[in-house]
Amino acid sequence: MKLTSHEEYGLRCLIRVAQQGPGGKLTIPEISSAEGISDAYAGKLMRMLRLSGFVVATRGTGGYALARPANEIVLSEVMALLGGRLFEGDFCATHPGQLKACVRLPDCSARVLWRAVQAAVDDVLKRTTLQDLLFDEQQMMVHLKHLRESAAPARWQ
């Protein structure tokens, strides 16, 4: 499993805008230069983020700003826009190989594992905001430790 470039760069662009603080703006060239991507790709990602209500654009040389405070932007919403889930519940039924149905469909330990992994990822993303991603690495580790310690075991099943 790995993140797509849309997920990685889209999130990085959104973090970059959030780093400007309330009301702060960045233009496409500023975003693309800071993130090492083309203007066209930054523009495509920012358009997606704008159409989904994460950022607002000011025409001309105004640039992009957050549409709402960073502490109100939940990562599960952002990641759903940029790429979706790592493991979809119907994966086994839709990927049987050359057979009509996966031979392990009735009893599959791997499916249980992937569902638990997805539940853990979902839990972290639902309880993490864009504001949390403005932490430095050490602060983020503390945040994640807190999430892990406060997670109910049933959440990850």
Predicted regions span which residues?
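Alpha-helical residues within the helix-turn-helix
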Residues: S33, R50-L51
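Short, hydrophobic-biased segments on the C-terminal half of alpha helices
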Residues: M46-R47
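C-terminal regulatory/oligomerization modules of transcriptional regulators
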Residues: T94-Q157
